[in-house]
Structures are given as structure tokens and as C-alpha cells.
Amino acid sequence: MQIIEKYFKHLSPEQVKQFGALHSLYTEWNEKINVVSRKDIDQLYERHVLHSLGIAKVMAFKPGTRILDVGTGGGFPGIPLSILFPESDFHLIDSIGKKIKVVEEVSAGAGIKNIRTTHGRAEDVTDRYHFVVSRAVTRFKPFWGWVAKKFSDEQFNDLNNGILYLKGGDLDEEIQELNRPAYEYDLNMFFEEEFFDTKKVVHVPAF
């Protein structure tokens, strides 16, 4: 938890409480349904929570922003972002029902009010969003195909509506394959831990 407060110094008491609740909630649910690798559970705050919040260092969502988290797994990046941005609306979707069960239990246990969940596929979602977030669920080109028609044309954030994608390594080939403008932000510009040396946020504008 200290690592979150190290990089996000203006958390409200409620946010501190919610972030603080995540370790025990994930530890409990991970024993029933494995959503975080066993070796990572002790590094939950660095490798999952803070990693998710890397998106917040690139884009601070304004109140009323609608965000879709595709392939959320156990709730990353959606749950940490929903705590940090309580006035934005988050829709977390995954095709595996037991993972959505964990998301629902963790968000309820932490008292998070601005999340809704769907057990299903991104292609079947009919709503419109300002941003789609995800954490390395597939290559950019197929991912774009899943979400290209999900974007609202209502623009009011500092970045253009689009994808904010957490990925690592050399992405040149994937971005070339995507054949759309894409902007890379190295997370080691914001976080000093070695884990983030090769981690990035990629912004793919929708329009």
C-alpha cells in the first residue's frame, strides 16, 4: 500500500481505505479462484495495482468519463482506476465468469460504487465509451477490431478518446501492423521500480 501513496500523494481517506482493502480481498479470493499468479500476490500493489495506475499518469479521467475495461481478468486495470477516479464510470468485461465473480466480490468488499460488470465479450457490448483500457490481452490489431465501434464522439478529456493499453517490450512491429497513430509512454518515467523498466501505456486515438 505504501507504494501507492508514494506515487499518488493526494488520496482521500476513503481512497486509502479502498486501496488498503485490496490485499486481503484478493488474497482471500485468489485462494478460491486464481486470478493473480501465486508468486505475484505478495507484490499485488506493485505489479497489479500500481501497474494499472500507470494509465492515470498518462490520462487523468475527468468526472463523467465512461471507461470500458476489456478482458479485465481479476479487475485490472479497472478496479484500481475506479478507486482513483470515483466520479468516472467503469464497465469491466471478461469472457470468463469466475473472474467477473472475483471482480464483483472485490469491488463490493472495497466499497467501490462506480463499477458495473459483464460476463461476455467486447464485441457484444453496445454502449459507447470515451476510453477503452486493457492489460495485454492480445495484439493491437485484433483488439482494435473488437472495440473500434465502441467510442463516443463526445470529447472532453485532455487526450482524445481511444484505447489506453498496458503493454511491455518492443511494440514497433505491433504498432506497424495496427497501421494507426499510436503514442507510447514509458512507465519508468513515472515509477522507479525495476518492474516498470519495459512497461508502457499506449494511447491509440479513436478518431
From Swiss-Prot:
It is an enzyme of class 2 (transferase). SUPFAM superfamilies: S-adenosyl-L-methionine-dependent methyltransferases (SSF53335). Disulfide bonds: none annotated. InterPro entries: rRNA_ssu_MeTfrase_G (IPR003682), SAM-dependent_MTases_sf (IPR029063). The keyword Nucleotide-binding does not apply. GO terms for molecular function: rRNA (guanine-N7-)-methyltransferase activity. Its EC number is 2.1.1.-. PANTHER family: S-ADENOSYL-L-METHIONINE-DEPENDENT METHYLTRANSFERASES SUPERFAMILY PROTEIN. Specifically methylates the N7 position of a guanine in 16S rRNA. Belongs to the methyltransferase superfamily. RNA methyltransferase RsmG family. This is Ribosomal RNA small subunit methyltransferase G.
